[in-house]
C-alpha cells in the first residue's frame, strides 16, 4: 500500500481527451463512446524512482457551464495537467486564453504539465481534411512546446489514449512533479479565495 498520496487535477476544453486519458491510465481500456464529464475521481498506484505513490486523479468538465463548479476540485492539489487536443488548435489557444489563468488563480505555485492529447490524429487524413476546411492544421510538437514556455509549465508531453502511446509517461512525469511540491518549505496547496 502506498504511504505517499498525491492529488492530480486535469483541466482543458470539453472533448479534448481528458477523461479517455484518465480511464486508459487507471483502467487500461479506451472508452469508445463520448460522455461529457461533470466530475469523476479515479485512483491509480504509480511507482516512480522507487517510490510507491497513490495518485488521486480528479477529472473535470471543460464546458463553460461548469466554470463555477470546477474550482471546487482544486483544493489540496499537488499537480495540474492542462490538456488540449492535437486535432484542435482552438483548444491550444484556450490553454493560454482560459486555462492557465484559472489554474494560476486557484493553484499558484503548483507544477503544471501541458499535455497534447489525441496525438494519433496528427497525421490522420480525415482530421487533416476537416481542419483544412477552416484553414487550420493539427498542432505541432513545436507549437505545444512554445505554449509550455509561455505559460511556465513544468513539462510538455504528448499522448494518445486510443493507442496508449505516451500515457504512462504523462502520469509518471506528473507524479514526479507532485513529489517535488513536498520539498518546498512552505506548503503550497490550492485554495479557493
Swiss-Prot record:
Residues 191-193 form a propeptide. The keyword Lipoprotein applies. GTP binds at residues 12-19, 59-63, 117-120. Its main location: membrane. It holds the Pfam family Ras. GO terms for cellular component: cytosol; plasma membrane. A motif (Effector region) lies at residues 34-42. The keyword tRNA-binding does not apply. GO terms for biological process: actin filament organization; fungal-type cell wall organization; hyphal growth; regulation of actin cytoskeleton organization; signal transduction; small GTPase-mediated signal transduction. The modification Cysteine methyl ester is found at residue 190. Keywords: Cell membrane, GTP-binding, Lipoprotein, Membrane, Methylation, Nucleotide-binding, Prenylation. A lipid is attached at residue 190 (S-geranylgeranyl cysteine). InterPro entries: P-loop_NTPase (IPR027417), Small_GTP-bd (IPR005225), Small_GTPase (IPR001806), Small_GTPase_Rho (IPR003578). GO terms for molecular function: GTP binding; GTPase activity; protein kinase binding. It is found in: Cell membrane. It is a lipid-anchor. Has a role in cell polarity, primary and secondary germ tube emergence and cell wall deposition. Belongs to the small GTPase superfamily. Rho family. PANTHER family: RHO FAMILY GTPASE. This is GTP-binding protein rhoA. It comes from Emericella nidulans (strain FGSC A4 / ATCC 38163 / CBS 112.46 / NRRL 194 / M139).
